């Protein structure tokens, strides 16, 4: 039986420093039936040249150049437009894949006969040891998958997942352009609601880079948190699966985004400039934390949410300090390993 073709759509914008590692990790996959779609979003560095160089080396690579910057949603829609594979995988141009990432995702989605499959993700600056076995693979209902994604108990974003292209095309699912952030969350949200079931693996085979200073994960920008609040509220309006489990999850996600907004504003020192947003977010977190704590099953999270609801400003500052400390430690380990 011929293997299924996988279209890997890579979103690229000013990532020349990291792009070679990203592309090398894709072309070196142990699963070979790939269509590699590199979409450059009008980069001003050498990203475009790197793409063309690799296209000359590997016939599986197709390169598309945007004449103006359209952000992640526009880039990924271009990739979808030109994809022909049975499955779709999205990769950010500054991230990279474990050598068997695609074969592992294929195993999950085909073994479970699902419409999409999810694996775990490493948020890191360096390669980490992989498990020697594939571990447990689960099948989730759309309700459970949506709740776990929205809470979020899983990494939000379109990467670290594989999608059945037929489902995407049949339901005309595309990225919503014009959003500043969370366009990937919205896409996954739409796919899950149209899926019959979702396969879930336990291995971390997608590496999300932490040391890109322009990444949403490492760069403070209040537009990220405020945009996320807008997107999640819109998702709540558009819910098809309106069970208590999903509604509790989405309410918690909204609450977490308001807490994130407090963190962003504090990190940027804009408490006075963004006073209305800052004060409203504090009020929202204080007013609604009890329901979030009651719904949360994990003890450590219960404690964190309780403290965040009672002392949102203090906890936001501590969370920012923790995030910065973790990044510094990871970078120190990366530099140490590189010098060995």
PLM region spans:
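N-proximal low-complexity "stem/linker" segments adjacent to membrane-targeting elements
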Residues: 1-27
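Acidic helix N-cap motif at the loop->helix transition within catalytic regions
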Residues: 20, 45-54, 96, 100-102
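Membrane-interface aromatic/basic loop that binds lipid-linked glycans or pyrophosphate carriers
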Residues: 268-340
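Donor-binding/catalytic cores of nucleotide-activated saccharide
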Residues: 72, 93-201, 206-223
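Catalytic core of nucleotide-sugar-dependent glycosyltransferases
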Residues: 196, 203-212, 218-245, 260, ...
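Conserved short acidic donor-positioning loop in nucleotide-sugar-dependent glycosyltransferases
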Residues: 26, 41-42, 70, 93
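Glycine-rich, basic loop-to-helix element that forms the pyrophosphate-binding segment
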Residues: 66-83, 90
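A conserved acidic beta->alpha catalytic loop
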Residues: 40-49, 68
């Amino acid at each position: 039986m011929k293997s299924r073709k996988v279209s890997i759509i890579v979103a690229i914008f000013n990532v020349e420093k990291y792009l070679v590692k990203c592309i090398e990790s894709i072309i070196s996959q142990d699963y070979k039936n790939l269509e590699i779609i590199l979409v450059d979003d009008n980069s001003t560095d050498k990203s475009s040249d790197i793409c063309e160089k690799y296209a000359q080396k590997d016939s599986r690579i197709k390169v598309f150049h945007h004449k103006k910057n359209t952000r992640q949603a526009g880039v990924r829609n271009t990739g979808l437009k030109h994809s022909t594979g049975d499955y779709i995988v999205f990769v950010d141009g500054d991230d990279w894949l474990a050598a068997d990432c695609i074969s592992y995702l294929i195993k999950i989605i085909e073994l479970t006969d699902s419409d999409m499959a999810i694996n775990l993700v490493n948020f890191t600056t360096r390669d980490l040891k992989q498990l020697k076995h594939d571990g447990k693979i689960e099948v989730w209902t759309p309700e459970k998958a949506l709740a776990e994604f929205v809470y979020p108990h899983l990494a939000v974003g379109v990467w670290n997942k594989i999608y059945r292209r037929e489902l995407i095309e049949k339901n005309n699912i595309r990225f919503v352009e014009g959003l500043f952030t969370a366009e990937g969350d919205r896409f996954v949200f739409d796919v899950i609601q149209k899926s019959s079931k979702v396969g879930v693996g336990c291995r971390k085979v997608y590496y999300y880079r932490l040391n890109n200073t322009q990444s949403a994960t490492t760069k403070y920008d209040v537009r990220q948190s405020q945009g996320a609040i807008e997107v999640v509220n819109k998702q709540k309006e558009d819910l098809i699966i309106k069970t208590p489990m999903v509604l509790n999850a989405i309410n918690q996600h909204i609450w977490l985004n308001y807490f994130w907004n407090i963190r962003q504003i504090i990190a940027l020192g804009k408490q006075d400039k963004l006073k209305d947003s800052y004060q409203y977010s504090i009020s929202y977190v204080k007013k609604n934390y009890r329901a979030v704590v009651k719904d949360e099953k994990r003890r450590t999270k219960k404690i964190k949410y309780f403290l965040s609801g009672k002392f949102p400003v203090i906890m936001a500052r501590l969370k920012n300090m923790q995030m910065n400390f973790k990044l510094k430690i990871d970078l120190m380990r990366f530099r140490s390993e590189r010098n060995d």
